Structure formats: C-alpha cells, structure tokens
A protein has these predicted regions:
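C-terminal extracytoplasmic interaction modules
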Residues: 1, 56, 68-75, 83, ...
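Polar/acidic, low-complexity leader/linker segments enriched in S/T/G and N/D
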Residues: 1-94
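The right-handed parallel beta-helix/beta-solenoid scaffold, focusing on the short coil/turn
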Residues: 149, 217, 235, 243, ...
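Short, conserved beta-turn/loop elements at beta-strand boundaries and strand-helix junctions
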Residues: 174-183, 249-255, 259-263, 509-516
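Short, T/G/N/S-enriched strand-turn elements that build extracellular solenoid repeat scaffolds
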Residues: 546-560, 576-586, 627, 727-732
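Glycine-centric low-complexity/flexibility signal
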Residues: 571-576, 595-724, 734-740
Length: 740
C-alpha cells in the first residue's frame, strides 16, 4: 500500500526561556518580558534578539491503524491527521517563461493535542494543553505565518523507512483554517520569485537630504548612515525615477561623475526624492545573471539549489553569448526570469526530488533519446493537440535600450531592431505570425545575440508544436523526468505517405500516480536556421543506452577535422549507458564531462538453461580522450545465480536478481519466487531470501552477481576498457575495473 507522509519544518528556538544551556543564554525574564514562557517560536519570543532557530520537523499521515514509522531505523512520531492530499503538477514552458508551479494541497483534520514536541515547558503550564484548543489553530497562533516554511511530501510503501521514501521538496505558499479543517498549499520553490515576494533591485531607502540643481556634482543621502548601509562605493542611481547618474561614494555623499547618464537628462530634484540604486549587469553570462537574481534578490532561495558549474557549462558552451542590462527600478524577479528564458532560449524548472533548479538551453532532442511507443503507452491515452497560437513566421527584436526609466515595450526606446522572416512559412500557412520582442538584455553592439534569438525562435516555432498527452505504465524501465527530451510513436503521428514516425518532444508536465505516469509534452521539431552555430558541444541530458560519441556528434555537426576541440557533457540526472568513444580523425581533441552517470548495462540473472549475464562496460575507447568525472562511472553488475536445492538443477525454486546498470538486468523466474530486476544503482534481490533455495542477488555497479549452492552468478562489468587512452582530468567515483 502506498503511504504519503507530509513534513513541515518550523523555526524552533534552541534556547530555554530565561536559562543558560549549552545552546546559549535566553535573557528573557518571566513577569518582566512576558507573562508566560514562550513556545520557542518567533511570534511568542520575549527576547527576539536572542532567537536562535533550528528546524523542528512535524510529520503527518492519513489515519492507518497501527502503522509505525522510522527514519534511519529510529522511531519517529507521525500525527495521523491528514484527510486528503492533491497534487497539481508543474507545467514548464520551453523558451517562453517559467510556466506554472507544482502545487500540493493538503487538508488536515484539526484535533486536540498534548503539545508534546512543540512545547518545552509543559510542566510549567497551569492548564492541560489537550483540553485547550486544537493542534493547527495553536500552530497558526504561535507562528506569524507558515508561508515560506519548508514542506516535504514523502511517498513510499507501507513499512518503508522515511529515509528510503521518495521525497518531494516544496515551500508553503498559504495556510488557512476553517471549522474543523486546516489546509496547507505548498508549491515548488519558484513561487519565491513571485512579484509580491521578490524584486530586483530592492527598493533603496536613501533620499535627497537637500535639493540639487541640474548641474550640481554631488548629493547627500538621508537618513544618516544609509550610504554605508545600502550603497556601494560606485555605481549608478536613479533620482526620482527621472534621471540616472553615475557616482562614487564616501559615507553619505555621492560624487556624481556623470549627470543625465543612460539616456536620461540632467534635471533639478527636490529634498526627499528617492535615490534608487540601479542594478547593473554588464557582459555577463545568462547563467550568472539568473544565479544572482535568485540568490541575492529572491528571499528564501538556497544557493545549494543551483549547480552553478553545470549552468555555466550549459549556457557558456552552447549559447556562448553575454548579456547586459540596467534595471533602474524594482522589478519582479519573475518578470526578469521570463525575459531571459525567452530572449536567451532557455528551459527552467524545479526538480522537486533532487532539490535542484534546472536550467537547459533550448535545443533539439537527440535521435537516440528514449522512444515511447505502444509497448510503453497505455492504450487509448495518447492524444495530439494542435497549438496554432504558438506558430511564428517572423521575429522582430528591438534591442539597445535607450533609457531604462522609459517603457519597456515602446519602440522609440530602442536604438536598433532586427527582423528575421521565414518566407516559406508565410507561404505554407498563407499568413504571417509575427513575434515582437523588446529586449533590455541585448546591448546595441550585440547584434549577433539578437540575430541568434530570432533564428532560435523561428527554428523552434516555425511550425506550431503539438501538445502530446499520454500515460505510461508505472513499470517502464525508462522513467520520464520533467524537462527531458524523448521520442514518441503512435499510429496518429504520420508522415505525408502515411508511415508512422517517431516525433521528438519534451516533457512539460509529469504527474506520478500509483499505476502510471501522466505526461504532457510539447513537440520539439527544430527547423534549421542561420546564426545558431556555436562551439562543438554535445549534451547528453536524457537517459540513453548504446551511446556512440561519434554518432552523436555526426547527428548535429559536420564531419570532424583534425585539431578540432569537441566536448561531450552528460548532464546531472542523465545516464549515458555503454559509452563507446568511436572512430575519429587523427588529433581531434575530445573531452567528456560526466555530471550524471556513465553506466554499463546490468547483467540478467541465471535462468533455466541460460547462464547469468556479465555486467557491461561503462566506457570503451581506443581513441585518446580526456574525462572529467564529476558524477559516477560504473560497470554493470553481474546477474545473480538461480536458487535450487536439487543438483539436477530442476526445479528452480527461486530466481536470481538482475545486476545494477543501465539498462538494469532482469531477474529470473522461480517456481516459488522470482528474482527482482536490478536498478540503476543496486542489484536486484534473489527470490526467497533467507531460505535454503534462495536465489543469488544481482551485483551492484561493477560487482559480480551472487553465487548459490547450485547457481552461478556472473562477473561485474568494467568501468573502463581503454584506460591507457584516457587523460583523467578528474577520476571521481568509479565502480569496476579500469583495463587496457
């Protein structure tokens, strides 16, 4: 039976009221600072300057009899007060905006509670907490708001340790009580970028201490001390939303080194007018800009959620362009993110399982990406929906913003424009579909970036992408992930001859149900356009097996020549199965960066008249290549031996387990119990564990399958075959032998 546990983290003070402990001293005095002791929350704190919070985790589940829970083997308290849990999956919008947030809505039954776990001073209270109030009403009263608190949804099977359950990470967006119910709505962390929560730049608190004329060369800020508190040593400020000035600063005095800067005019200003700091990005990679906007201007964003190295690799080496902007007034972070997603060509989403913000460039799906067809798609669930509103035949981009204080969508506020037209698209559809973009991010001298933007949008949306909706069986090997590219095949997808074709697509919404995965995807056909060439970088950002690097290269680039530099990058979360470097001309400089995993295939378990299969090799090469392993390289695990008590080897009471790898090995059949299939990280268990006829376990990555009395497991696979050809930039985590 599937079990769902909800966890909330409440900021809970480590100190004890009026006491000195190893955690520190609370200076509160009962009867002076408060009439009763606190509840160790900020709202009830009598000495806020000393508030020292750590997360207190509260856990909840649906009523389920005598079910007990553990975390890392230790019993934990889980309150059985959940009435319902509903999940609305996220929707990503490739190359357009950040899409819609994933939402978890939990309805709780409010109930009396003893205040155990949430009150350090139960013995000092002059009332019985169980007889006074209810749990959630008291929780709400003791905290200023639950909004922004960490929220986790754990899903597993009954009896699973909480640490082994799949955990989805969110933040609370709202909480409310009505009658005997209490409702919490949590969303993915991009809700923190909402316009009501995050602005960049932040509003400045400095104002003019005295008026200035249009020719004055300095100004003084008020209140005293605000200069050191909020303003850097140099930069730009916008005065009263009318004039931008460059400055250097000493204390509260700004020396105005350029009046009427950034396309504005010098003007006189009155005492008390706001002096707003301008946020400036000059020739920065989009990955750097987005990281800064999120980490420094979006309260609650944890820098650990951002893999800056992977982001930089993605945009610097695939997009290869820099961007600039002056943001002269507080602007919604979500607005800035949406502009960059569209104008750079990005896909951006929250990975709720890995707790990572994912950033990818808008690019074609590999011809070797996972194929979903009739064997994986549940019958009658496939639908293809036309989306004519997404078609583009012309892109007009205005760039080189004149004045950051003027309207963003005013044509006269831009120095340059470029229009890119696909005349065949206009002819095919007998009408134009014009897309206008007003970019603060593309400087007037950066025409190549504007040209690339136009070509990229035409490439992606020249033909309106269809929406594909379908359900996949829960038992499939290639589990889909949000944002991943794949290929889909259905009788309704045909070419002009009526032949069924496999169309490329990208997962835009993923809902996990008990027996299926419900997928929404967007067709990802790219029509070749000019201005899209970059350095030769090949990304592997979806799971693939049988990866030949030369084949992948030749699918997107022309024939390689000697002395070319070519990089392959396995993205975080992606698996490259059975990597073969392939044949290349002499002196090509090859590098593969593994941020995800490179795995050999798992061996199948021993069966009747069938030997167990050895694990496969993860990386094979006979050509020089450099490897920067930031993830995992692992040979496949060997299949386990079957289990039987008969020297005649019949019957086979228990099947052996499949080896770890990609794809994982299959378990074998047994009369009493089958062996389990392997996974990408662990070998499957043999059947009938703990009996005399138990099947052998499949091997972990690079490990042999387990032998039994009469059954024989197979050898583990090699991590690398061709080690002498490799220049190891970083060895990283390796499972299995390195040979030759």
């Amino acid at each position: 039976m599937t079990v769902t546990v909800i966890e909330l983290d409440i900021p809970f003070c480590d100190l004890r009221y009026g006491e000195t402990t190893t955690e520190g001293t609370c200076p509160a005095v009962l009867g002076v600072d408060s009439e009763r002791k606190c509840f160790n929350t900020i709202r009830t704190c009598a000495a806020r300057a000393s508030f020292t919070p750590s997360p207190l985790t509260l856990r909840f589940c649906m009523p389920a009899g005598d079910v007990e829970f553990t975390r890392n083997g230790q019993p934990v308290v889980v309150i059985p007060s959940i009435k319902s849990v509903n999940v609305t999956p996220a929707i990503i919008n490739p190359g357009v905006d950040i899409g819609n947030r994933e939402t978890v809505r939990v309805v709780f039954e409010d109930h009396p509670h003893s205040d155990a776990m949430v009150d350090k001073y139960l013995a000092d209270r002059d009332y019985d907490p169980y007889q006074r109030g209810t749990f959630f009403a008291k929780l709400r009263a003791r905290n200023p708001s639950l909004e922004g608190y960490a929220f986790r949804m754990l899903v597993g099977d009954e009896g699973d340790d909480l640490a082994d359950m799949t955990t989805y990470h969110y933040v609370i967006d709202s909480a409310s009580g009505q009658g005997e119910q209490f409702t919490i709505a949590a969303k993915d962390v991009l809700i923190l970028a909402d316009k009501k929560k995050a602005q960049a730049p932040r509003i400045s608190n400095g104002v003019l201490a005295a008026g200035i004329s249009e020719v004055d060369g300095s100004l003084t800020l008020s209140p005293a001390g605000i200069g050191n508190a909020e303003y850097p040593a140099s930069g730009k400020v916008a005065i009263a939303g009318k004039e931008i000035c460059s400055f250097t600063r000493s204390g509260d005095v700004l020396t105005l080194t350029q009046r009427g800067d950034s396309g504005t005019e010098a003007d006189e200003h009155d005492e008390g007018e706001i002096v707003q700091l301008v946020l400036i990005y000059e020739s920065e990679a989009p990955s750097t800009i987005i990281n800064d906007i999120l980490v420094n201007y979006t309260p609650g964003v944890d820098p650990a959620w951002i893999n800056t190295a992977e982001w930089a690799t993605e945009v610097d080496e695939y997009i290869g362009r820099l961007y600039s902007a002056e943001i002269a007034e507080p602007t919604s972070v979500i607005e800035l993110l949406n502009e960059l997603i569209e104008q750079v060509g990005l896909v951006f989403w929250w990975d709720s399982i890995t707790k990572q913000l994912r950033l990818r460039s808008l690019r074609p799906v590999s011809a070797e990406a996972t194929l979903y067809g009739d064997d994986q798609i549940m019958a009658t669930t496939f639908r293809a929906t036309e989306q004519p509103g997404k078609r583009i035949s012309e892109v007009w981009t205005y760039y080189g913003q004149r004045n950051p204080l003027e309207g963003l969508d005013e044509v006269k506020n831009y120095r340059a424009a470029i229009a890119t037209v696909d005349p065949e698209a206009d002819q095919d559809y007998e009408q134009s579909a014009i897309k206008k973009i007003f970019s603060r991010w593309i400087a007037s001298n950066n025409r190549p970036a504007a040209s690339r933007l136009n070509s990229m949008l035409l490439s992606r949306y020249r033909d309106a992408p269809r929406k594909f909706s379908f359900s996949l069986y829960e038992t499939i090997d290639a589990v889909p992930t949000l944002g991943a590219g794949f290929r889909v095949e259905s009788w309704s997808l045909q070419d002009d001859t009526g032949a069924v074709v496999a169309e490329p697509a990208q997962v835009t919404s993923l809902e996990r149900k008990e027996d299926r995965y419900v997928i929404d995807a967007q067709e990802a056909i790219f029509v070749t356009q000019e201005d899209l060439e970059t350095s030769k970088v090949v990304f592997i950002d979806e799971n693939m097996s049988g990866v030949n690097l030369r084949t992948l290269h030749d699918q997107i680039y022309s024939t390689p020549e000697s002395y070319e530099v070519i990089r392959f990058i396995v993205s975080s979360g992606a698996i490259a199965g059975t990597v073969v470097v392939g044949d290349w001309p002499d002196f090509v400089d090859l590098t593969i960066v593994i941020n995800g995993q490179a795995l050999g295939r798992g061996g199948n378990a021993q069966g009747l008249l069938v030997n167990a299969q050895a694990g496969g090799t993860a990386i094979y090469t006979r050509y020089p290549i450099s490897i920067d392993n930031q993830g995992t390289i692992g040979g496949g695990g060997g299949g386990g031996g079957f289990g039987t008590t008969s020297s005649e080897l019949f019957p086979i009471e228990a099947g052996g387990g499949g080896g770890a790898g990609y794809p994982p090995g299959s378990g074998s059949s047994g009369v009493i119990e089958n062996g389990q299939n392997g996974t990408t990280t662990a070998g499957g268990l043999g059947g009938a564990q703990g009996t005399a006829y138990a099947g052998g376990n499949g091997g972990g990555l690079g490990q042999a399958g387990q032998n039994t009395t009469y059954g024989t497991g197979a050898a583990g696979g090699r991590a690398v075959d061709g080690d002498s050809y490799i220049n190891w930039i970083n060895l990283g985590t390796v499972h299995g032998a390195r040979v030759n």
